[in-house]
Amino acid sequence: MSAEEKNLIEILEEGHKVDVVKYIDYVSAPQAGAIATFSGTTRDMFEGKTVLELRYEAYVPMATRCLSSICTTARSTWDIHKIAVAHRLGPVPVGETSVLIAVSSVHRADGLDACKFLIDELKASVPIWKKEVYTNGEIWKENSEFMEKRLELAEKRDSIVKKTVVEEHRRRGCCGSKVRVEEDEEHKDITGDNKSSS
């Protein structure tokens, strides 16, 4: 069974609930001594506001590709057997699951670390958007993980650009290693070291 066949990735259309047992059963295997799961559910309060439901939208083809890539990265980092990722679209009432991640592994540490990585990366980079609906209004939410990742990527990009500019300047510059400074013979001692002329 290839690594691709050991991943179950589903973006569930509106009206379909996350069947937690289905995904845990999928990752179960005799060689797996651990199954780590994360279940994200709609809570009833956020910053003092009463939440009625969350509503999710996604660019499904890209979301699926991103999740597949994240699973590949997890597999290359930890010794894991199977991965299941499910995310609902549409309204998700209070108390219901919107996202589930299940990871099976021989040992718990790999499963737990991979599970945390998968949910963090999902929230930071997968094109799934959330609207929080309150008793007194609604708002599209931007994940803090997404913003942190954008800042991190911008800092890396800026660092790479600066490094490239500096390297290019050094390579093409009129100074630096291309200029050879001839030392005045009277300022050298017999060992060849420079002497101060003060």
UniProtKB/Swiss-Prot annotation:
E.C. numbers:
2.8.1.12
Localization, per the record, is:
Cytoplasm
- Listed GO biological process terms: Mo-molybdopterin cofactor biosynthetic process
Instruction: Give the Gene3D superfamilies listed for this entry.
Output: Molybdopterin biosynthesis MoaE subunit (3.90.1170.40)
| CDD domains to which the protein is assigned, alphabetical | MoaE (cd00756)
| Keywords (A to Z) from UniProt | Cytoplasm, Molybdenum cofactor biosynthesis, Transferase
Its main localization is cytoplasm
Q: Which reaction is recorded as catalysed by this protein?
A: 2 [molybdopterin-synthase sulfur-carrier protein]-C-terminal-Gly-aminoethanethioate + cyclic pyranopterin phosphate + H2O = molybdopterin + 2 [molybdopterin-synthase sulfur-carrier protein]-C-terminal Gly-Gly + 2 H(+)
Q: Which Pfam families match?
A: MoaE
Where is substrate annotated to bind? H107, R108, K123, K130, K131, E132
Q: Which domain of life is it from?
A: Eukaryota
Q: Which residues constitute the signal peptide according to the record?
A: none
Q: Name one GO cellular component term.
A: molybdopterin synthase complex
Instruction: List the Gene Ontology MF annotations in alphabetical order.
Output: molybdopterin synthase activity
User: So what family is this one in?
Assistant: Belongs to the MoaE family. MOCS2B subfamily.
Function, as annotated, reads: Catalytic subunit of the molybdopterin synthase complex, a complex that catalyzes the conversion of precursor Z into molybdopterin. Acts by mediating the incorporation of 2 sulfur atoms from thiocarboxylated MOCS2A into precursor Z to generate a dithiolene group.
Q: What is this protein called?
A: Molybdopterin synthase catalytic subunit
In its UniProt entry, the species of origin is given as Arabidopsis thaliana (Mouse-ear cress)
Q: Upper lineage ranks?
A: Eukaryota, Viridiplantae, Streptophyta, Embryophyta, Tracheophyta
